[in-house]
């Protein structure tokens, strides 16, 4: 799916970010990308911060024995932003990691934001450290990074949550939208592929159906 838009696989040693509102298909794209990495003989780390990952959905999209696939998937389900940091640190000890996925990178971060400046400063430092560790471990393992992100309101409509930090360190940024049963991916930022290209697709029970690719 993403290789159609990026004109190649998810780039290694950099962050690819997909952002959009809830229910548009971000997790489905993560699962498809995960299965692609496993097909290439790699293990995948999946950090699920929102409880979105479904074993049944993995089975539907793969059409294979899920028990066998799960041997290649290391799943973490942190319940706090600190636990998310701890999960990232564990990746340094793993072998043959081809892809690191964080589904909902700032979900726990946003839940813990409060009116106390000191606490928010601590959270911001933790987010910066997580990005640093992500990039460090991806370079060590020669792996790709795929993160999903929520949205927030802005003057121009919606924009990714997480501020300038995530925007700066994400070398690929993809927006996902939904209109009835049709989803649209738009490439907003990339070092090599053509920015502005978009891909329309449908989510089916057993996969994703590409409708067309165009430039806007």
Curated annotation (Swiss-Prot):
- Which positions does UniProt annotate for ATP binding? 20-27
Q: Which positions carry the signal peptide feature in this UniProt record?
A: none
What's the domain of life for this entry? Archaea
Biological processes, Gene Ontology terms: DNA recombination; DNA repair
Q: Does the keyword rRNA processing apply?
A: no
Query: Key word Hydrolase present in the record?
Result: no
Q: Care to name a GO molecular-function term for this sequence? A: ATP-dependent DNA damage sensor activity
Q: Which UniProt keywords apply?
A: ATP-binding, DNA damage, DNA recombination, DNA-binding, Nucleotide-binding
Query: Which residues span the membrane?
Result: none
Q: Per its database record, what is this protein's job?
A: Involved in DNA repair and in homologous recombination. May regulate the cleavage reactions of the branch-structured DNA. Has a very weak ATPase activity that is not stimulated by DNA. Binds DNA but does not promote DNA strands exchange.
Entry similarity comment: Belongs to the eukaryotic RecA-like protein family. RadB subfamily.
Name listed for the protein in its UniProt record: DNA repair and recombination protein RadB
Species of the source: Methanococcus maripaludis (strain DSM 14266 / JCM 13030 / NBRC 101832 / S2 / LL)
* Gene, per the UniProt record: radB
